A protein has these predicted regions:
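"…together with the soluble PPM/PP2C metallo-phosphatase catalytic core" -> "…together
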Residues: 1-37, 41-229
Length: 229
């Protein structure tokens, strides 16, 4: 258990330091390319001053997280969990990239249309379930109740749960991302709880899965440093 915990902490620290080292240069480069946020005309007057704030910083967070997880867990690359979790991580990051890119190109605050965005999110969520079902050894439809060590097989409800876990979670972050630091703070609280739950089941959950979870915390902490208030 001590080695697993050390591995988790190492993933977090290395990733966090990497984000802090890379992000300043990335911000300068994004400013040079004029990849800035466009504020709505009907928005608050105080928000108008934020126009031009570099966007697409999520590219750095995701790349740093994935690089750290793969390098520090190179001995576990035969484990399908790490590739599956990376797929979902990068998949939703790609949806966000397309959304931001359209905002920059069009010079308006309208990125992907809601229907298109939800469709892409749905594709990633459904693909995740299909890949898990066919490539994860011993895949089943049981869910674990954290700390109580109780498992309940929910059968056909499982794919529905997975679908809404991804789509609802993604949109929840989007909705809270309107105020500086709000999505970051809430994400850190939620992810910290998941880390505690995962550590409580450390002997049943691959450490690569925990490492990917910590990669999310790298993203959240990096956002506090560079995008927070």
């Amino acid at each position: 258990f001590n080695m697993v915990f050390l591995r988790i902490v190492l993933n977090f620290l290395v990733g966090f330091i990497l984000v802090l080292a890379v992000m300043p240069k990335a911000i300068q480069y994004l400013k040079k390319l004029k990849f800035g946020q466009v504020e709505r005309e009907e928005g608050l007057q105080s928000h108008k001053a934020k126009g031009g704030t570099p966007t697409m910083g999520g590219i750095v967070f995701i790349l740093c997280a994935v690089v750290v997880v793969y390098i520090l867990n190179f001995t576990s690359l035969n484990n399908p969990y790490i590739h599956l979790l990376t797929f979902s991580f990068v998949g939703f990051g790609l949806v966000g990239f397309i959304d931001d890119y359209l905002i920059v190109v069009r010079k308006t605050n309208d990125g992907l249309k809601p229907l298109y965005k939800y469709t892409l999110q749905s594709v990633v969520a459904i693909a995740f379930y299909i890949l898990a079902k066919f490539f994860i050894p011993g895949f089943d439809t049981a869910i674990s109740i954290p700390l109580l060590h109780i498992e309940i097989d929910i059968g056909w409800l499982y794919p529905i749960l997975v679908y809404f876990m991804f789509t609802a979670g993604s949109n929840a972050v989007n909705l809270t991302d309107g105020l500086d630091g709000l999505a970051t703070g809430l994400s850190m609280i939620a992810i910290s709880v998941f880390v505690i739950f995962a550590i409580s089941a450390v002997f049943r959950i691959p450490t690569t899965a925990l490492s990917m979870l910590l990669a999310s915390m790298i993203l959240s902490n990096g956002r506090i440093k560079h995008l927070g208030p």
